[in-house]
């Protein structure tokens, strides 16, 4: 479905399908569904014509609730902190765009991040209304991200990841470990943990796999850490962090594994002082449309 509202400053309208329920008006639903959004904000959006249905019809405080209807609106943030690091575009053609993401920058809007996201920055700068990430990196991870530029060919590139046709290489800094002979392959069953933003490994059929090799020792200032090369064969959330932690070599500045660490809480005076030492160094694949072998590498280092 095409959105009936335009993209503004790189921000696409959000949408919400109306479920079955007891509400008489759309405003009643919005007030209950989004209790943290003040009613005055919804009324303001309505007055500006920035809350519409799937046909582009403006909604108001008395608009009747329709099960199955789709409403569109723009997310707004009262304030949004600037992220003082720039992305780089490594490649672009009529089908794909490849970006080199800095640490701390989310890929897509969520929570307290809207304009300061890789997607919105790129859409605004390059005027690419159909731009969509084909895969994701965590906000804390830097490195290579592949985007689809053309909706008509997007499925070819999402299929590459779904069918594990993309070769991914990560680099990580973690403690040196002499009792393991590298390279080693870690397989485990990863499920959602507690709190909700953590994952955990449990006994069960493996649903994740990573090949890990050890490289040279890092500079002395890194406290004897070692550089590791990680090749994930699957893409579970926090997979690399969990697998490294499970081997007894948690990635530096992780803060989530093996335990939730308050000691690594972000410094309020400098929230960017301790980036996670994890970098999506490269991706490579055979282009599904022209058969060319592509290799894209981040210029960033840990």
Q: Residue locations for each model-derived region?
A:
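RNA pseudouridine synthases
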Residues: 1-302
């Amino acid at each position: 479905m095409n959105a009936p509202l335009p993209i503004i400053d790189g921000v696409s309208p959000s949408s919400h399908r109306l479920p079955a329920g007891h509400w008489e008006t759309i405003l009643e639903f919005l007030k209950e569904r989004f209790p943290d959004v003040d009613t005055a904000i919804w009324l303001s959006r309505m007055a500006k014509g920035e809350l519409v249905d799937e046909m582009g019809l403006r909604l108001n405080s008395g608009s009747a609730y329709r099960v199955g209807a789709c409403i569109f609106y723009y997310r707004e943030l009262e304030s949004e902190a600037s992220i003082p690091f720039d992305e780089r575009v490594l490649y672009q053609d009529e089908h794909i765009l490849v970006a080199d993401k800095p640490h701390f920058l989310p890929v897509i809007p969520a929570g307290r991040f809207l304009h300061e996201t890789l997607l919105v920055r790129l859409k605004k700068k390059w005027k690419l209304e159909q731009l969509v990430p084909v895969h994701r990196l965590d906000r804390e991870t830097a490195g290579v991200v592949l985007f689809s530029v053309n909706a008509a060919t997007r499925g070819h590139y999402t299929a590459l990841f779904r069918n594990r046709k993309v070769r991914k290489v990560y680099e990580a800094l973690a403690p040196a470990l002499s009792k393991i002979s590298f390279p080693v392959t870690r397989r485990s069953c990863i499920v959602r943990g507690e709190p909700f933003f953590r994952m955990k490994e449990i006994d069960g059929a493996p649903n994740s796999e990573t090949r890990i090799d050890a490289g040279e020792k890092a500079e002395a200032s890194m406290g004897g850490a070692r550089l590791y090369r990680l090749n994930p064969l699957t893409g579970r959330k926090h997979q690399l962090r969990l697998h490294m932690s499970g081997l007894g070599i948690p990635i530096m500045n992780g803060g989530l594994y093996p335990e939730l660490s308050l000691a690594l809480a972000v410094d309020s005076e400098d929230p960017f002082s301790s980036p996670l030492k994890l970098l999506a160094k490269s991706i490579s694949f055979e282009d599904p449309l022209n058969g060319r072998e592509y290799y894209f590498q981040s210029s960033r280092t840990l």
